[in-house]
Amino acid sequence: METSKEFEFRPAKETSRSKSPGGIVGRLSNFARNKARHSLSEKGSNSVGGSGGAGFDKPRKDLLKEFHKCKEAQDQRLDLSSIEITSIPSPIKELTQLTELFLYKNKLTCLPTEIGQLVNLKKLGLSENALTSLPDSLASLESLETLDLRHNKLTEVPSVIYKIGSLETLWLRYNRIVAVDEQIGNLSKLKMLDVRENKIRELPSAIGKLTSLVVCLVSYNHLTRVPEEIGDCHSLTQLDLQHNDLSELPYSIGKLVNLVRIGIRYNKIRCIPSELESCQQLEEFIVESNHLQLLPPNLLTMLPKIHTVNLSRNELTAFPAGGPQQFVSTVTINMEHNQISKIPIGIFSKATRLTKLNLKENELVSLPLDMGSWTSITELNLSTNQLKVLPEDIEKLVNLEILVLSNNQLKKLPNQIGNLNKLRELDLEENELETVPTEIGFLQHLTKLWVQSNKILTLPRSIGNLCSLQDLRLGENNLTAIPEEIGHLDSLKSLYLNDNSSLHNLPFELALCQSLEIMSIENSPLSQIPPEITAGGPSLVIQYLKMQGPYRGVVMNSQ
């Protein structure tokens, strides 16, 4: 079970092609987000146009009428998005009062030269078209601050862009750009640069001239290096380099003293420069899916604001050197899929804010003696290790809500597990358990209990006390019977009894589980139920239990 928080830079956060990036990007410019709120039918003193939601499919002459209306009303905003425009009539040059022009989601392959006469334009939205170039006349737009060219067919950054010195926000995501020219250094006012999802192999050294740059998003490209000059971008707070081919970071990264977030996951990085410890404002350290074998000593200790640490899918064999102090402010730790064999005693003794710990897919053979001190943890994932014993001190994790221990070598559970009063999910699949302790019945908030693929022979009668249980998975065990108390599970929705070769009957009380929606009985003989009934599947089996059992009247009256 995943316990790590998704890094906000990840594209999974942007499900709509027209959705603007979040965080500071959204604060820098929200015009793309709002474009769908306006329609041609809206009347206002400062806007005209539409987002296409009303089925607007006007011929050229009607488009000219919109220009005329806009000019007559001296509207400063014109939205002609989603109306399948293939070209812009030249009379647009007369709309010199415009400060915002939106042409999103059309079929434009080029822009007219006349657009350069809109000298008051501050925002120009052109995303989701088929543009391959821009007219040189755009250099005349000396007031332009925001240019959105996402989702076009650009193979290079149009040279005219480098001449628009007033630009503060430049979106070029989802194009086919292979390079960024040294002339990018001319854009001295640029605060946000988004070139994600292109084919860029290298950033120019002139990137260092962008001293006003606050957000730089370069993920999903083919970068093999980052220039040392990036360290001169001293205003940077967000640097996204995820999903590239980087093998190292420049030492100058330490000069980015205002950096709050750096995205370097899914690269080929083998070491982190110790200079990163100078980035005292960093709040997240996410280096998932690289080739790290260790971190610089005390690196995390020197970053006091770190609340999220994700070192998953690397080649670590031990915890980072830095002792308990390195996790003082940490809320989430994800170190899954490494080669860690030991959790140092006391490593979390100062982690009073730690709520989520994921050590899935490592080589742990035991848990530390002070495990009981992890009292703040709410989610603990220790699946796919080599654990043979769960310490009795597990009961001290009083805030635990999710416990994942699947795919280990556990032979028994401590009775103290029943003291985890807040536990909602317990995953014990693929272990070597032969019994489930009676104390399991004390877990009144448990909604999910997975114990499939063990060696369980019987269940305790206390299973019927799990009043919140919704998902019970008992498949692939050695069960010989199901306790009649299962009928008390009023919230049960899913029940898996498959692949229990010694299970020959089901209790009539199962018919009392009125919330049951899914039941699996494949490869369980159920020989004491007529074969023509079992052949009909779980639904018919439940009907049989209703009709044949002593609770027939109760069940029928509740229908």
From Swiss-Prot:
Known outcome of mutating residue 430 to K: In ku167; suppresses an activated ras mutation and dramatically enhances phenotypes of mpk-1 MAP kinase and ksr-1 mutations. Moderate increase in resistance to nicotine-induced paralysis
Impact reported for residue 233 to Y: In ku242; suppresses an activated ras mutation and dramatically enhances phenotypes of mpk-1 MAP kinase and ksr-1 mutations. Abolishes interaction with let-60
GO annotation (BP), single: fibroblast growth factor receptor signaling pathway
Chain positions of LRR repeats: 74-95, 97-118, 120-142, 143-164, 166-187, 189-210, 212-233, 235-256, 258-279, 281-302, 305-326, 329-350, 353-374, 376-397, 399-420, 422-443, 445-466, 468-489, 491-513, 515-536
Sorted UniProt keywords: Leucine-rich repeat, Repeat
Function: Acts as a Ras effector and participates in MAPK pathway activation. Probably acts as a scaffolding protein in a protein phosphatase complex that specifically dephosphorylates Raf kinase and stimulates Raf activity at specialized signaling complexes upon Ras activation. Required for vulval development. Involved in fluid homeostasis. Plays a role in nicotinic acetylcholine receptor (nAChR)-mediated sensitivity to nicotine.
Protein name, entry field: Leucine-rich repeat protein soc-2
Gene that this sequence comes from: soc-2
